[in-house]
């Protein structure tokens, strides 16, 4: 249910006591380190499913007048340096909103927010426009926005003053388009491999990709796959998203 995420990251006092009593110190350590000691979790409910922009707007009382990150869980990115770390480093240089993007192929543009960039230079690109899910023949580029954003608090102004669309939804893409009238927004082509875990096939690919690199069971799992006739398997160190 809705409390699953809260329960997962909550302190499990009874479980910790049980693991300690049984001397299962490795498991106890793993449970205790789910959340770093300097991190506090705050949860905000979206009372109605009124679009991604509305969900972001629900966080305004918590975020306030600070830059913040948006992470969409469907997009799992296998990267040696976590993509948000890459983007935070860039934010430290430009001090403006940043959208993670990747080339999605012309036929896939109708599944993404697509950006128009002002330069043809290397990433990061200054964004000149953004449109939600255009048909391939109308797409300004093939750079699609994926589920990692760093946004300045100015975005809340545009979310609050946006005219709701179909079904009363408030779209983040529309607010970003309006934000372009106030300040620069950058598109960042990240380093890493993205899996769209809203897709059944990509979900399975992600499980396989992470399993063969798992520090505990990776070697055994690769052996199992080899026994099934799979010969092209990775053996890289674990990556992070």
Regions found by a protein language model. Name each.
Residues 211-241:
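Generic C-terminus detector
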Residues 1-23:
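N-terminal FAD cofactor-binding segment of flavoenzymes
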Residues 27-37, 78-82, 103-110, 137-138, ...:
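Low-complexity, flexible helical/coil segments
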Residues 14-18, 25-117, 153, 159-162:
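Conserved beta-loop-beta/alpha segment of the NTase-like Rossmann-fold superfamily
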Residues 69, 88-92, 119-223:
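Catalytic-core segments of class I nucleotidyltransferases/pyrophosphorylases
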Residues 2-7, 51-52, 79, 196:
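Short active-site-adjacent helix-start/loop capping segments
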């Amino acid at each position: 249910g809705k409390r699953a995420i809260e329960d997962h990251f909550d302190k499990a006092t009874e479980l910790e006591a049980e693991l300690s009593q049984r001397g299962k110190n490795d498991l106890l350590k793993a449970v205790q380190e789910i959340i770093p000691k300097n991190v506090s979790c705050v949860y905000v409910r979206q009372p109605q499913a009124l679009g991604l922009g509305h969900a972001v707007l629900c966080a305004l009382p918590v975020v306030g007048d600070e830059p913040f990150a948006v992470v969409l869980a469907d997009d799992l990115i296998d990267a040696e340096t976590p993509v948000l770390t890459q983007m935070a480093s860039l934010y430290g240089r430009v001090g403006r909103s940043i959208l993670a993007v990747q080339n999605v192929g012309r036929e896939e543009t109708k599944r993404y927010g697509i950006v128009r960039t002002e330069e043809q230079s290397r990433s990061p690109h200054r964004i000149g426009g953004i449109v939600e899910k255009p048909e391939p023949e109308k797409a300004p580029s093939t750079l699609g926005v994926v589920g990692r954003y760093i946004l300045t608090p100015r975005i809340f102004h545009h979310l609050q003053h946006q005219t709701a669309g179909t079904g009363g939804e408030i779209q983040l893409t529309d607010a970003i388009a309006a934000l372009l009238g106030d300040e620069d927004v950058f598109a960042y082509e990240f380093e890493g491999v993205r899996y769209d875990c809203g897709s059944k096939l990509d979900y399975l690919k992600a499980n396989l990709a992470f399993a063969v690199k798992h520090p505990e069971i990776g070697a055994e799992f690769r052996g199992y796959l080899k026994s099934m006739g799979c010969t092209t398997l990775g053996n890289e160190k674990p990556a992070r998203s």
